Amino acid sequence: MGCTLSAEERAALERSKAIEKNLKEDGISAAKDVKLLLLGAGESGKSTIVKQMKIIHEDGFSGEDVKQYKPVVYSNTIQSLAAIVRAMDTLGVEYGDKERKTDSKMVCDVVSRMEDTEPFSAELLSAMMRLWGDSGIQECFNRSREYQLNDSAKYYLDSLDRIGAGDYQPTEQDILRTRVKTTGIVETHFTFKNLHFRLFDVGGQRSERKKWIHCFEDVTAIIFCVALSGYDQVLHEDETTNRMHESLMLFDSICNNKFFIDTSIILFLNKKDLFGEKIKKSPLTICFPEYPGSNTYEDAAAYIQTQFESKNRSPNKEIYCHMTCATDTNNIQVVFDAVTDIIIANNLRGCGLY
C-alpha cells in the first residue's frame, strides 16, 4: 500500500489550490470554528486519527507524552502475547517445543499480577522472545480472527529486542500503534487552513455510545471510521456479532439520523494495510456470503464501500469516502487536507460563494 498520490488525491490537491485562491480573492480571512465528530465502532482507528492530528497540526508528542505512553507499550506487548498463549489452550494448538509452557506461565503470571506496565526483566524478555519464535505460537497467531487480539500485536512482538532494551524510548510509530480503550469524549483543538478545528473522539464500544448525543449540536461534519480488516472478526463486547455488520448498522443509524440531515459525512475505510494482507487469506464471503467478486484488495474494498454508501437514504446527502491507514502519517495528511477542502467548499456553498 504505497503512498504515491492517486488520481483522487491529485484531484484533491488541485481542488485545494483553487479553493485557497478563491478564499484569498473573496477576502474571507476570519477563521471559522469547525466542529468535527469522530464516530465509529470500537477499534476502528478513531484515537489513532486524533494522535495523527497532534503530529500533523500540533508539535507532535512531548517528552511527557513519551513517558506516559511507555507503560502502555509494555502492556500492549505482553498482553498481546498473553492473549495468544490463552488462545493456544482454547484452540487446542500445541507448542512447537514443550519447554515453552514454562515461558508462557511466566508471561501469564506477570499479567495476572498486574505488572504488565513494567519494563521487562532480562528473564521475562528472553521468555517472550522464545515464545514469539515458537511454531505453535505462530500458528495460533495466524488464527487470530478466532479470538480477540490487538491489531498491533505483530508490530510490537517483532520489536521485542528494541522494546525490551534498558534505554527504550517509544517512537512516534510505537505511540501511534498503542491501544487504550477510549471512555467518554476526548476533545482536541488545532488550526488548519484558517479554520479552528474542535475534534471530538467518542468511545466506540456499545456502552459508550449513549454519551454521543451531547456532541450532536452544530456539528460541521462527521468522520465515520470503519476497520476494513474487521470483516472476519467479532466484537469484543458481543462475540455473536460480526464487526463489519456492527459498523454498517451504526453507520445506517448515524447517516440517517434526523440530527444529521444537513451534516457532511466523511467515511474513512481504515486499516487498508491490514485489509490488503488479510484479504489474500480470508475471503470476504465470511462477512458478505452474497459477494460475487474476487478476493483482491481493489474489488473487495470497492464492494465494502458500496455497502456503506447504499445505507444513505437521503438523495441530497453526499458521502465522501477515503481509504485510509491511520498509522501512516503521510496518508492521513493527504486525506485530511482533502477533508478540509470539502468542509471549506461546503461552508462557501452555504454562504453562496462557491
From Swiss-Prot:
Lipidation (N-myristoyl glycine): G2
Catalytic activity, reaction form: GTP + H2O = GDP + phosphate + H(+)
UniProt-annotated stretches for the region G4 motif: 266-273
Residues where GTP binds: E43, K46, S47, T48, S152, L176, R177, T178, R179, N270, D273, C325
Domain G-alpha, first and last residues per copy: 32-354
Pfam family, one: G-alpha
Family assignment from sequence similarity: Belongs to the G-alpha family. G(i/o/t/z) subfamily.
Protein name (Swiss-Prot/TrEMBL): Guanine nucleotide-binding protein G(o) subunit alpha
Lineage of producing organism: Eukaryota, Metazoa, Chordata, Craniata, Vertebrata
Gene: Gnao1
